[in-house]
């Protein structure tokens, strides 16, 4: 069985054990530190670096026990007397008490959270649990921590060749931004997270209709955090105002009219800054099935790098300085460096 979403670790004062929480499988792994160090020392350097971190069999040599917990265990604290440890069971609002002599859960403390399991709460619990994946290897939260992104690209095609990477997209604020998937072929979250999920991700039976409805509902409630580049109610800085003018412009620096589809605001207009359509912006790679990709929303775009459908742009600047040679992703090649900097400053405020 997998050990998804390892979240926190604490070592006993005597240095004998390390306790690691798995928020995706509702367990704590008890690691015998001496056995782990012995394994590391006897392995050749190559295996230490390249095999041990990914070998699913090695943990049997140093994980001596798994302790069941409440839902979604995260933080863990070991008391200085080496007698007890406490773990936060985040999604059932309890504090678990562990007897370190027995390495067992001996009690819980109710933290007074809501007792009714609403549709949103149930969806949140399902989102954070790896029960739906083969061997419980990962949860929805594994790739979308806090409903956001892990900064990775994935090849999720079933051929297993690894030649069609796609950028992981945020789930924050995606209500009313359908369609989904970079190719824009899923018209709803139910389509995105339903049977398709079982085929390409979980390799098990899909969510039941009731579970799927709860997960979908929870995803639509994941909020965007406050924008750190533009506090609520704040006016734009001079650079941000200049960037907005670039974003909204209809003429290039030489006075020529910019074609409608080459204007930023044509495809990215408020409030979500997406027209919810597919466009070819010149980023198609040789193994891509299509060059038409879904227009992502731009809200809080500053913290969702990398960019473009396959994550090839490491920064916002690279979208236009490296991957827009023919002005197919907006008319930008006439811009000065200062203008591009201002545009990026404005984009960070969205």
Region roles according to the model:
Residues 1-350:
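Periplasmic c-type cytochrome electron-transfer domains
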